[in-house]
């Protein structure tokens, strides 16, 4: 990671460094310059989620892009994967998303996609960062006659919905299927309901009234309880919860049980293997994946490899090893046969397609994987020293690992997008994992909080 760019772009509290209008303008300028080339009329797409600060950052980005002689196309509110798709399909030079994903509305972020729909490689992000931090842009500004223009794109949502529907097998139908959607008052609030309605489902929608401040507030993929209750109330077949920018998914079965991202991966990988679409017979998972996923895949005779947390690292391993599916327990799942990045709506469509193909309710499909007891505690931190350099923390981790032996594991890592440390413990019982996780979290808070 650089000084500005983390594992998922630039993030921070809106109107505070680095998420200021001035920084957004500079990111726009630097990004535009990176994609300019002689004899070409470049264009950059800009999309956002529903945060209040999105207006400020959007206009600043446009100013920066146009000041460098590049055209900006404003898409408006659309899920992050929608920008990835549109950037590629429209042959734009780059796409920029203004969002902080599952974070509260006070936060915002900027992430950038290349013209092929993939997130920018680290070296390009570092080059943009270098231009900004070392004030290299003033001498690069074009003449007034060469300034760029800004346009609004009115049919972006419709184009994206057409793409989404094409990921659902044409021979299947959702007629008579009851679906409940939790849109987190975020970027999916119009796209997701319209997509499932057009596929023939009976749709009930929750948290689809964004006001700029209510994104992710007690709703969405991190708070699926209301969705689960509504699925039971409606007698629905399935429920889907998205996060604020629509790149992750949490599913709820017809009995109100909440599935993890790992369970979704196991279900979809099994169907893909049966259809001969699981390339290299390989699934990419992360260090945060539940042990149960590895066990389930082994029983299915499916190979898996593990990588660092972060969808960009999952994607890198998928591309390097020829895998067609990979993801995180948090609900980021990448289907490379369909998309270049994690897409919550695409994932939901693949889950419901699996239900139709297998002819089983989601509760039965979920039995493919036993979820091992796991506790995760996030601790706000003021500093981020290497874990191995904090003696008290090293000692408590070692103590817990010795007590768990081969029946569990401990993972302590810093978040790549927020100032916090994540403590995860897996073990034989929920009581033990909670007890040990609290022990470690208390030390983290004392030493780093």
Curated annotation (Swiss-Prot):
The record's CDD domains line, in alphabetical order, gives: GlmM
Tell me its cofactors: Mg(2+)
| Annotated GO CC locations | cytosol
User: Which modifications occur after translation, per UniProt?
Assistant: Activated by phosphorylation.
User: Is rRNA-binding set as a keyword in this record?
Assistant: no
Q: Where does Mg(2+) bind?
A: 101, 243, 245, 247
| Entry keyword set | Isomerase, Magnesium, Metal-binding, Phosphoprotein
Q: Which InterPro entries match?
A: A-D-PHexomutase_a/b/a-I, A-D-PHexomutase_a/b/a-I/II/III, A-D-PHexomutase_a/b/a-II, A-D-PHexomutase_a/b/a-III, A-D-PHexomutase_C, A-D-PHexomutase_C_sf, A-D-PHexomutase_CS, Alpha-D-phosphohexomutase_SF
Post-translational modification Phosphoserine, affected residues: 101
One GO molecular function term of this record is: magnesium ion binding
What catalytic activity does the UniProt entry give for this protein? alpha-D-glucosamine 1-phosphate = D-glucosamine 6-phosphate
Name any Gene Ontology BP term.
Answer: UDP-N-acetylglucosamine biosynthetic process
Question: Which note does the record give on the cofactor?
Answer: Binds 1 Mg(2+) ion per subunit.
Give its E.C. classification number: 5.4.2.10
**Residues annotated as the enzyme's active site:** 101 (phosphoserine intermediate)
Regarding protein family, the annotation reads: Belongs to the phosphohexose mutase family.
Q: What does this protein do?
A: Catalyzes the conversion of glucosamine-6-phosphate to glucosamine-1-phosphate.
Question: What's the protein here called?
Answer: Phosphoglucosamine mutase
């Amino acid at each position: 990671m650089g000084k500005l760019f983390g594992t998922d772009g630039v993030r921070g509290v809106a109107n505070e460094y680095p998420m200021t209008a001035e920084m957004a303008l500079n990111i726009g300028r630097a990004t535009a310059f990176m994609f300019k080339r002689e004899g070409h009329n470049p264009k950059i797409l800009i999309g956002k989620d529903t945060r209040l600060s999105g207006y400020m950052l959007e206009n600043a980005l446009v100013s920066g892009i146009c000041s460098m002689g590049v055209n900006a196309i404003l898409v408006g509110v659309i899920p992050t994967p929608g920008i990835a798709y549109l950037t590629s399909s429209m042959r734009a030079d780059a796409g920029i998303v203004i969002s902080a994903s599952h974070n509260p509305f006070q936060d915002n972020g900027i992430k950038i996609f290349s013209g092929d729909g993939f997130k920018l490689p680290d070296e390009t992000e570092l080059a943009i960062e270098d231009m900004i931090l070392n004030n290299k842009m003033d001498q690069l500004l074009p003449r007034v006659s060469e300034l760029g223009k800004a346009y609004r794109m009115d049919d972006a949502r419709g184009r994206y919905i057409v793409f989404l529907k094409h990921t659902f097998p044409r021979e299947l139908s959702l007629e008579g299927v009851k679906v409940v959607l939790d849109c987190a008052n975020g970027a999916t609030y119009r796209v997701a309901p319209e997509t499932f309605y057009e596929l023939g489902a009976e749709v009930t929608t929750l948290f689809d009234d964004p006001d700029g401040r209510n994104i992710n507030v007690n709703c969405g993929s991190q708070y699926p309880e209301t969705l689960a209750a509504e699925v039971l109330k409606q007698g629905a077949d399935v429920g889907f919860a998205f996060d604020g920018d629509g790149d992750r998914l949490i599913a709820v079965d017809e009995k109100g049980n909440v599935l993890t991202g790992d369970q979704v991966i196991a279900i979809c990988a099994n169907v893909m293997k049966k259809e001969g679409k699981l390339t290299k017979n390989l699934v990419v998972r992360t260090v945060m994946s539940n042990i149960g996923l590895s066990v389930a895949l082994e029983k299915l005779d499916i190979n898996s490899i593990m990588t660092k947390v972060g969808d960009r690292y999952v994607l890198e391993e998928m591309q390097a090893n020829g895998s067609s599916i990979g993801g995180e327990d948090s609900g980021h799942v990448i289907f490379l046969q369909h998309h270049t990045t994690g897409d919550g709506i695409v994932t939901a469509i693949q889950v419901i397609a699996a239900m139709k193909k297998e002819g089983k309710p989601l509760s039965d499909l979920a039995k493919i994987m036993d979820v091992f007891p796991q506790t995760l505690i996030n601790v706000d931190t003021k500093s981020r020293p290497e874990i191995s350099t904090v003696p008290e923390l090293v000692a408590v981790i070692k103590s817990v690992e010795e007590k768990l032996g081969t029946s569990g594991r401990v993972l302590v890592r810093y978040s790549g997008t927020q100032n916090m440390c994540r403590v995860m413990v897996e073990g034989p019982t929920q009581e033990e994992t909670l007890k040990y996780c609290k022990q470690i979290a208390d030390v983290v808070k004392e030493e780093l909080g």
